Amino acid sequence: MTKPAKSPDSHLFYQTRNQKPRVSHSQGVYLWDQLGNQYLDASSGAMVSNIGHSHPQVIEAIQKQLNQAAFAYRLHFENDAAEEFARDLSRVMPVGLNRVFFASGGSETVESCLKLARQFAISRGESSRYKVISLSPSYHGCTLGLLGVTQYGPLNDPFDSMYLEMPKIAAPKAYRDQDALSMDQRGERYADLLEKEILKQGPETVLAFLAEPVGGASTGALVAPESYYPKVREICNRYGVLFIADEVLCGSGRTGEYLALTHWGVQADIVALAKGLAAGYSPLGTVVAKEELVEAVLDDGGFMHGYTYAGNPLACAAGKAVLEVMLEENLMERAKEQGAKLRAGLEELQQQFEFIGDVRGKGLLLAFELVANCETWEVLPPAWNAHSRIVELAYEEKLILYSRRTRGGYAGDHLMVCPPLCINDGELEELLSKLKRTLIKFAIEHKLPTKLQSSHPILN
């Protein structure tokens, strides 16, 4: 197999040698490359650009802060941007979640959550608690610490001797279960796995349960049954286990609520936010925790943790402006409305393409799963690399999608369809039209059956 050529003028490296077009500029739901090609961003980057690209209100806020102070080290100065954004953020949180710790991105933020939880246990005289139970499959970040709570084979395998593996339970993929139970019964059965694992590990050793309320890259917008998170919360309370919600991807309004967990009427003890928090205008993440947790840690000597750029004024000015746009333009309600339309469009495609096994998600965090058989959930041949091939074909249509393996990183395929929350009806139609042409090309490549009229222009 021929290796992709490295660009002769590039000193950068990332995961592979693959070279993408160089971006020129962006606006709303579109990006342009340096050749003038216009792309519809149907994945908001990596589910980041929640308010759209190049919003003038955010640009103005960044420029204003840049003229005042771009950086002030947190041990030397407080800054208005961080204080004001923390205040504004606490106002959109559930009651009691009102203490904020800023970081620079998702991995830093989730790791900060785990360390805060650990110090809280120590402050209560429960130093035996250190185990964090998470889901399989799952993704919580790429640091060595977070690989222990992540289960996504290709990311774990090279480093498995370098980190502490934490216990896992099955993710609530109730949509695949073939039994006579109701969805609520399935949800409770999946939640019961948490209690069984706590008892197996020893309740006195279990620190926290960590989960994405709506699944991200590892499960493709997985939505648990209505009964799942209320039962999880009850189990955590019973055994003194903290519930940490990783809302790095699903939070910040993408599902139609500022926190995705709100859909279940449940509150976590600690929340991680990033990605859409500053919507790509600056690297930013934040821990939001219950006041009693933070006060206990501060009373016990302080939070033994920090980052150089924690509370960076430029990043916080961007985040504050993004939240203002989110609220002023009613983008969470728009995520619900446009998400319902997009989901209906994806479900229509599901009727036309037999290899689409499931359409799922909430708001504008949506995905569809590819299968060889909709009844048995048999996956497409892994050698097809269907998820990445569809992304390539979509690029030809000037449509940007996000894809991953569905089953632990080795098999199964899903595509994430998560445009900016500001997308309008005409842009939704364009997205679905480009996606349909992409799927037709994929079906032709692999001789897959469709229910399209044989007169369709791409089929001839």
Region annotations inferred by a language model:
Residues 1-460:
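Conserved N-terminal phosphate-binding loop of PLP-dependent enzymes in the Aspartate aminotransferase
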